[in-house]
From Swiss-Prot:
Upper lineage: Bacteria, Bacillati, Bacillota, Clostridia, Eubacteriales
Protein name: NADH-quinone oxidoreductase subunit D
GO MF assignments: NAD binding; NADH:ubiquinone reductase (non-electrogenic) activity; quinone binding
Catalytic activity: a quinone + NADH + 5 H(+)(in) = a quinol + NAD(+) + 4 H(+)(out)
Principal subcellular localization: membrane
Amino acid sequence: MQTQTYELNFGPQHPSTHGVLRIVLELDGEVVVKATPVIGYLHRGIEKICENRTYIQTVPFTDRMDYLAGMGNNLGISQAVEKLMGVEVPERAEYIRVIMCELSRIASHMICCGSLVQDLGGVTGFVFFIRDREHILELFNRACGARMTFNYIRPGGVAQDLPDGWVAQCRKFLADFKGMMETYDKLIVGNEIFQMRLKGVAPLSAERAIAMSATGGVLRASGVDYDVRKADPYGIYDRFDFKVPLGTKGDNWDRFMVRMEEMEQSARIIEQALDQLPEGPIMAKMPKAIKPPVGEVYHRIENAKGEIGFYVVSDGSLKPYRWHARRAAMINLQLLDELCRGFKIGDVVAILGTLDPVLGEVDC
């Protein structure tokens, strides 16, 4: 008897694609033979746009790449410009940057884990994550007037100081966060059905993860101990005590659990930063028109999705000659075909969820 594979379009308007992503699935019955991501539906030409903007004008565009973790994007481009100019950022601004980036990491992971739970049928778990994420968004709103697209971290420091009562509000969130994690453990992590949908599905060895340039939680879930905050500390990250969560099998379960544990480590970093937060200015003395000397720089940071890098070339003018972003979500999405092969259609949703793509960053 002869069988024939068939093609199925998954997306671009499917609720589980986390944006406008189309996946062309080649199937043998319900088993995936090939999975081809089709991207570009959200392409806006950000790199070229930024080459026609001043350096300070490029910062808001980074918010609209990984819009779920915009603080890290702001930090990456700001530190790249600071490297070009040789600017020293005030101590208080450095600590505020760390606090904001780690809050942003927790908020992003809450969306990642919550969406994964919902994709597998756990609507209640998703609602819990969204409810708790609101506390972080309120902290952002009070600090900079925006819940998602911030433009808060800028070359030289941060846009404005923390308002009165903000630190106390942040400490209250951290105190409540421990209870939130306990709830997740009981409701989601300990759920046998949830475990069965993830354990042993789409494993990725450390060797393949490195060969495919996997990054962030996807890389560490395969057991590779690599986090830019530890391997190549930027800002003041070398002052904090935290662990890098690792997996062993690199399957869906490990990718989920690494992010759950990373949220706890981020909370640990924030607590230390609040305890050490000094007084002082929040912005270095910067010229009104930022005009770096001729040169080039590549600067990388560890954002929620993984390592994101900014390559900036200055020709001495007010605008960058070349502006390029290495996007973690784009790189991790390239693993989709390899991870999906041999598994069923229902597993594609879970695999995609554990890769945690955000299409604003993928398409850029």
